[in-house]
């Protein structure tokens, strides 16, 4: 995608995603980027594909860890936008249950993302909600040098931690963290990843939702509804530190 946006000032792009994560997330929306030494996706553009071809049959070939990687993003959609979809996922018997209704799952996820992107292509408002779990998730990825945990594993743990922070701030219902933790564990994803406060600080400093001393933190008002809350970065770090202490 980044190459298509860059070569000759842009050439047509067709996406043919072959993992669950790319089918429900990165192939839809037009964000194209490459990683830099300083962090993920720091050089990029918005470049919409002319066509996205999704074949759910290719998912049968994925190792369980790669399938689970995509399930983190699937679960995210239920958390931020569709309580009924979250309940539907909760009733699935792991990977087998999801694959039994995979076409509906793909349509639901892609539809939700497309609806957001149509209204906020450039990620200045509503689209920020799609980053639920990602600020902390990027901290986990970078802290472990992008080797120990996959993107989906990091996002899963980030969603769980963000839900706990939301409860502390009085924004998120008390039962939400446990429900998300149960869901991610069902699909073989971690609900916690050890991380230092300095790693969190580095990730928050690089987060594109930040402006000056503030950052928009994506929290849940309830399961199925997210909100972007402006916070001082140091205040967010203080909340993270408290949650980390409570989990020792």
Task: Give the location of each predicted region.
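C-terminal charged capping/lid subdomain of soluble metabolic enzymes
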Residues: 72-75, 171-248
């Amino acid at each position: 995608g980044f190459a298509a946006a860059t070569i000759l000032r842009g050439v047509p792009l067709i996406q043919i995603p072959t993992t669950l994560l790319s089918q429900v997330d990165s192939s839809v929306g037009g964000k194209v980027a490459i990683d830099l030494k300083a962090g993920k996706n720091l050089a990029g553009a918005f470049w919409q594909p002319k066509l996205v071809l999704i074949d759910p049959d290719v998912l049968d070939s994925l190792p369980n860890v790669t399938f689970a990687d995509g399930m983190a993003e699937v679960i995210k959609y239920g958390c931020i936008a569709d309580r009924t979809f979250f309940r539907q996922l909760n009733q699935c018997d792991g990977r087998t249950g999801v694959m039994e209704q995979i076409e509906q799952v793909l349509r639901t996820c892609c539809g939700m993302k497309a609806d957001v992107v149509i209204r906020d292509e450039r990620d200045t408002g509503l689209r920020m909600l799609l980053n639920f779990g990602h600020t902390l998730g990027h901290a986990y990825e970078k802290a472990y040098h992008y080797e120990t945990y996959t993107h989906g594993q990091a996002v899963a743990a980030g969603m769980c931690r963000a839900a706990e922070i939301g409860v502390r701030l009085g924004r998120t219902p008390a039962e939400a963290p446990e429900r998300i933790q149960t869901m991610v564990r069902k699909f073989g994803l971690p609900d916690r990843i050890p991380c230092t406060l300095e790693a969190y600080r580095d990730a928050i400093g690089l987060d594109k939702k930040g402006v000056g001393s503030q950052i928009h933190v994506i929290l849940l008002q309830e399961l199925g509804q997210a909100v972007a809350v402006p916070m001082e970065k140091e205040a967010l770090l203080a909340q993270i530190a408290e949650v980390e202490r409570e989990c020792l």
